[in-house]
From Swiss-Prot:
The lineage of its organism: Bacteria, Bacillati, Actinomycetota, Actinomycetes, Mycobacteriales. One of the early assembly proteins it binds 23S rRNA. One of the proteins that surrounds the polypeptide exit tunnel on the outside of the ribosome. Forms the main docking site for trigger factor binding to the ribosome. GO terms for molecular function: rRNA binding; structural constituent of ribosome. Part of the 50S ribosomal subunit. Contacts protein L29, and trigger factor when it is bound to the ribosome. This is Large ribosomal subunit protein uL23. It comes from Mycolicibacterium gilvum (strain PYR-GCK) (Mycobacterium gilvum (strain PYR-GCK)).
Length: 100
């Protein structure tokens, strides 16, 4: 991902779960990101897309689950998640229509 022009190629989608929705109150947001992206690229992409100040970025590589099919076993796609903490004075991101 050395020569990515569009930051929307790095940030693929927000993670919609009970845990990620609860972390919004603490200015912590979770996104599914491109597997080859690094923390610096993720930080720059979030700041450009949402026009906020990012404090820190943590990443986690999640392996795909092994699932049974009719003919044997298959594998779900592996994902990379980024847990982004916004700076203290930054405005909240309105992803899910959460109360600010």
């Amino acid at each position: 991902m050395a020569n990515v022009v569009d930051p929307r190629d790095i940030i693929l989608s927000p993670v919609i779960s009970e845990k990620s929705y609860g972390l919004i109150e603490d200015n912590v947001y979770t996104f599914i990101v491109h597997p080859d992206s690094n923390k610096t690229q993720i930080k720059i992409a979030i700041e450009k897309i949402f026009k906020v100040k990012v404090d820190s970025v943590n990443t986690a590589n999640r392996p795909g689950k092994r699932k049974r099919t009719r003919t044997g076993y298959g594998q779900r796609k592996a994902t990379k998640r980024a847990i982004v903490t916004l700076a203290a004075g930054s405005k909240p991101i309105d992803l899910f229509g959460a109360p600010a």
